[in-house]
Amino acid sequence: MASNIKAAFDFTNIRGKLNPAQHGSNSAPPYSRRWLFNMDEEFKSLHFMYARTHDWPLWNPGQRLIDTHFIFPLLHLDPKDPKNYYFRATDEMLRITQEAGMKIFYRLGTSIEHNSDQANEHNNTLVPEDFDHYAEVLAGIVRHYTQGWANGFNYDIEYWEIWNEPELGTQTWCGTKEEFARFFVTVLKRLKSEFPKIKVGGPAFTTPLGEWQNAVLQACKDANIAPDFYSCHCYTNEPEKLIRRPREARELLDSFGFTETEVSINEWHFRQDWSGVTSRAPRDLVRYTMDGPLGHCNIQSAVFNLAVLIGWQDEPLETACYYGAGPDGVWGYRDHEHRWNKCFYSMRMFGELVSEYVYKVGVDVTPHPYRNIYAIGALSEDKEKAAILIADYAGSEAATCSFAIKGLENYRCVEARILDNTLDLAPCQVNIHGNTLTVAKNDPGSAAWLIEFEKIK
């Protein structure tokens, strides 16, 4: 490959299908303040396949939804009596989400509790007194949404996740890893016994590898029950670190004999500095973390998203959900002036790709000591349309980037759009000369392009 060519696309080499299930989010149109801010159409435009329900009470203030303690507030009561559940707010939230085009990925348990680092000051992350009783409560929730129980629904909710980040500390689980492993197995066995067709797993670890992870998987192996999926998280500014997480999880699962257990990375986000997103951070650290091109939800973050999503298409990863928690704020898609941020447009870019195209084609990226180019080529199901998505992460200095293309001789370019520090999916010029495609950069920072073609009639 010529030294000035960043990657080569071969549209004659179909390498399989795109996986749209990797394009999910932890957010949805909000239920609180819905009369003031209806965001259904904006979320539809992102084409997320899944919406994971973790932390939803935190950005729907005043609403008792999703978390077990909101749906079943008095844990000593009978979990087989429908009168002891409060489903109404969750019913509405799930309806809104599904009508916005997303499937539900339901996290059972509690949202994170940031009020203290002391176990005796927590309320919702305490270890349940009776694991079997708690499992019956969770069975009631699943039954309501999948079997129509308690004036419920027959939704096709496939994924049910047990807990979230238990090894993080008391803000998520106040017990030991041994207690959690026993709790996880108890709930897993109870739910699979009544609902064999759903997928039950978890527990949304902060990383795929570690002592807690081994303890939970060993407990499952000892109990002779495999989780249907294994979920974990990652926050970083290194695309390659996040792209290889599924491989690490896959190898761990296989080592325990869980070769059929799926892998899910269902919280992930660009992270410059954890301290800079807290209210106690010095102002200069907040500015470094949040503002400018390298900011938390700005162009570096947006192109990072695309680099990861492109890279994952060749990894052993069944599902993923971006953290995206609520539409506004530090982890959202809008800034304090309600302008859609760069991450919103990056998710829209990838959503358009996986919703309109089916097949992925061969791409050979030029080796580089520090990889900054991530690229994917795609074809529609009928092969009448083609697309190229390019992410230039952390910005090559070149004013232009060139790519070799093969197999598009009978296609014409119908649209090209750029996402960079100043433009949000704006139309742009591309130069196609023979079998070479060249795109221009407006500045040396991160940028991404979505270029679409249609077959000449």
Predicted regions and their residues:
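Conserved, mostly hydrophobic/aromatic
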Residues: S25, T97, I141, W160, ...
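Aromatic/acidic polysaccharide-binding cleft in carbohydrate-active enzymes
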Residues: F270-A375, D382-E384
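Carbohydrate-binding surface patches
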Residues: H368-N410, A416, N421, S446-E452
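Substrate-binding cleft and catalytic face of glycoside hydrolase catalytic domains
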Residues: L46-P239
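Alpha-helical scaffolding within the catalytic cores
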Residues: I5-T12, R34-M39, R88-E92, Y145-G148, ...
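Mature N-terminal, pre-catalytic/accessory segment of carbohydrate-active enzymes
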Residues: M1-F48
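C-terminal beta-strand-rich structural cap/linker in extracellular carbohydrate-active enzymes
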Residues: N431-K457
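Noncatalytic carbohydrate-binding groove/subsite architecture in carbohydrate-active enzymes
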Residues: K177-N305, E315
